[in-house]
């Protein structure tokens, strides 16, 4: 392989390809002599869109094929939505750059209602996320949440043909695909706390590939990296995955990190939440300590119950 080439592994969905082109454009801007070649791939997660993620092994199904391509030296980097990435990496790989984060919030979309609070009892809301389901049931107990899979276009089509009264999607994905006009309402974190890593693009690479590591470092956005490190540290301590409703959202306020998080039951009947602040050097410590607090206040029992199901 030429030293002036990077092979980029990506999923084939429109959003994944947008993210891949974003990274390609950035790398070629900072390194004018570099040529980035996209290697679109179909992952296991793309092949089982009819089944809820919580029942199929989680979002790691969307990254394993890409990781294998990097490990086998068929690709040099893999580009992911960080919220889809597992907490632990295969030996030899790592999350080496976090691009500047897009809006991490959730969006409410409906053809009939202008505000999520207007939903009447019995309204059907679509989402594939247990985190969103938990918070929707907590705040609006009269609604019915049903699973919603597929890429963004497929989900919008299901809304348009009347399968759902409303759906909830990530703001970042809609903005990246030029679909801001479909958003009815952006949900405040107090109503729908985002998932760890939501809205952020991550670059995975072989840790011994020093040349590529130096190149992709130019795309790393330090403030976004700090927030993501904080959010994912909490998830690691909780050992939380797609089968568990967990929100983990860090912001920078007054020159310090502010992490808010919750662990909940899927039906929204029980939610343990909390927050913690600290300096930038303590990003992972903040997440770890808040996780311990949540565990001591009842999250451990929720997680144990979910693991038995």
Swiss-Prot record:
A UniProt-annotated Pfam family: Porphobil_deam
Listed cofactors: dipyrromethane
Modified residues (S-(dipyrrolylmethanemethyl)cysteine): 242
Involved pathway(s): Porphyrin-containing compound metabolism; protoporphyrin-IX biosynthesis; coproporphyrinogen-III from 5-aminolevulinate: step 2/4
Gene3D superfamilies: Periplasmic binding protein-like II, Porphobilinogen deaminase, C-terminal domain
Role according to the record: Tetrapolymerization of the monopyrrole PBG into the hydroxymethylbilane pre-uroporphyrinogen in several discrete steps.
Assigned protein family: Belongs to the HMBS family.
UniProt protein name: Porphobilinogen deaminase
Organism of origin: Hamiltonella defensa subsp. Acyrthosiphon pisum (strain 5AT)
Gene (name only): hemC
């Amino acid at each position: 392989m030429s030293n002036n080439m990077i092979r980029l592994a990506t999923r084939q969905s429109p959003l994944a390809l947008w993210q891949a082109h974003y990274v390609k454009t950035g790398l070629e801007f900072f390194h004018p002599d570099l040529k980035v070649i996209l290697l679109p791939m179909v992952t296991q997660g793309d092949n089982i869109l009819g089944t809820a993620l919580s029942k199929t092994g989680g979002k790691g199904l969307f990254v394993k094929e890409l990781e294998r391509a990097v490990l086998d030296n068929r690709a040099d980097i893999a580009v992911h939505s960080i919220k889809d990435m597992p907490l632990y990496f295969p030996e030899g790989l790592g999350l080496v750059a976090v691009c500047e984060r897009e809006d991490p919030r959730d969006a409410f979309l409906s053809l009939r209602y202008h505000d999520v609070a207007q939903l009447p009892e019995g309204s059907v809301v679509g989402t594939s996320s247990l985190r969103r389901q938990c918070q929707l049931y907590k705040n609006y107990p009269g609604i019915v949440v049903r699973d919603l899979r597929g890429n963004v276009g497929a989900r919008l089509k299901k809304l348009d043909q009347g399968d759902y009264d409303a759906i909830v999607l990530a703001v970042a994905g809609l903005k990246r695909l030029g679909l801001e006009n479909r958003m009815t309402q952006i949900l405040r974190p107090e109503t729908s706390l985002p998932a760890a890593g939501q809205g952020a693009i991550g670059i995975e690479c072989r840790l011994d590939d020093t040349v590529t590591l130096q190149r992709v470092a130019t795309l790393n956005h330090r403030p976004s990296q700090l927030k993501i490190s904080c959010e994912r540290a909490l998830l690691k301590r909780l050992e939380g995955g797609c089968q568990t409703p967990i929100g983990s959202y860090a912001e920078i306020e007054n020159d310090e990190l502010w992490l808010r998080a919750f662990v909940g039951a899927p039906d929204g009947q029980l939610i343990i939440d909390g927050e913690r602040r600290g300096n930038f050097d303590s990003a992972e410590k903040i997440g770890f300590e808040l996780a311990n607090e949540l565990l001591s206040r009842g999250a451990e029992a929720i997680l144990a119950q979910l693991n038995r199901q």
